[in-house]
Amino acid sequence: MLEVVISDIQAREILDSRGYPTLYVKVITNTGTFGEACVPSGASTGIKEALELRDQDTSRYQGKGVLQALKNVKEVLLPVLQGVSIFDQILIDSIMVEADGTPNKEKLGANAILGVSLAAAKAAAATLGRSFYRYVGGCFAHILPCPMMNLINGGMHANNGLQFQEFMIRPIGAHSLQEAVRMGADVFHTLKNLLNDKHLATGVGDEGGFAPQLKSNSEALDLLVLAIEKAGFQPGEEISLALDCAASSFYDTKTETYAGKNSQEQVGILADLCDRYPIDSIEDGLAEEDFDGWELLTAELGENIQIVGDDLFVTNPELIAEGISKGLANAVLIKPNQIGTLTETSEAIQLAHSQGYTTILSHRSGETEDTTIADLAVAFNTGQIKTGSLSRSERIAKYNRLMAIEEELGSEGLFKDSNPFSGE
């Protein structure tokens, strides 16, 4: 029987949803089967993320070109991967990590390595005639994730004065992924009408949520609660709220304060918001270096709500293990491009789950039409996904893919709709 191996890798520079370059990669086997992947890019990034290689040539794309990463795919990764079994994902990824030889993939670029890693896995799935989620997750892949929908954008995702980066809804009362998407869409359109009535802008931010000029984080939360009610749902019962504070973006490392507030005061602000609003998840409520603050936040709120580490962990198994040992957070945001390979992404998720931490598969603010994260959320049974609002086709593509997976799974599929920290 002919062994199926990597025979060619193609790559090209494409544009993401913000109009900046990113990589498209195609891995082709000796039997003609292939897999394709487009690499996302973040605006709000953790300092310990794997390096996204950019050209720094200011004469094109404001220095954000990825021609060097593209060159690395063709001239470095292709030669070392030709002839490698398409089904040996661990070997494929380890060869690339070794070829790079740096702790944060700065030599070849995490964007180059991830593109090849994902495209190779998709080529393997195509060779077997399987859906990508089924190839990666096997027979255990069956949980449809509850979406965390970013309806109001702030922080580094919008230029509107809001301190926090994402104000999200979670359709926890839905009984299926399709129903969850419908509920989110109803609230999204209701919110747009509310903004129009208040003569507020209805332009959207990077992730498809609205970016109105508001005076405070509380005003954004008030609008979401009102939109939920006007759409015919019960806040906290059918639809809950979630925050991504992206606190590192407003943390002063010299004074160790958050807009003038110390860590304990910042935790107090978040606790007060949880008392006043049906919030059941807070991401990056403290800065990534503020371990003492994270301990306070987890102790204060961690028994009742999800405390999510993004910049804190950057999908890195070593950092996740360190955080677990210190009792920081109780959930991990998973972004494959933060670590750079499918194998390491899998390791991060398995480690988190083994220690009772929940996981959330996440997009980036710079996305493409690639729907990989939808399949990965089901493959790894994360139970939750962040893939933006109910607008912009690069966000909607993921929801549409999830609904297709739900239909394919049929009675085998289970929609994950509860907060694991609520005691329900």
From Swiss-Prot:
Gene3D superfamilies: Enolase-like C-terminal domain, Enolase-like, N-terminal domain. It catalyses: (2R)-2-phosphoglycerate = phosphoenolpyruvate + H2O. One of its GO terms (cellular component) is phosphopyruvate hydratase complex. The active site is at residues 207, 335. Transmembrane segments: none annotated. Catalyzes the reversible conversion of 2-phosphoglycerate (2-PG) into phosphoenolpyruvate (PEP). It is essential for the degradation of carbohydrates via glycolysis. This is Enolase. It comes from Chlamydia abortus (strain DSM 27085 / S26/3) (Chlamydophila abortus). The lineage of its organism: Bacteria, Pseudomonadati, Chlamydiota, Chlamydiia, Chlamydiales. The gene is eno.
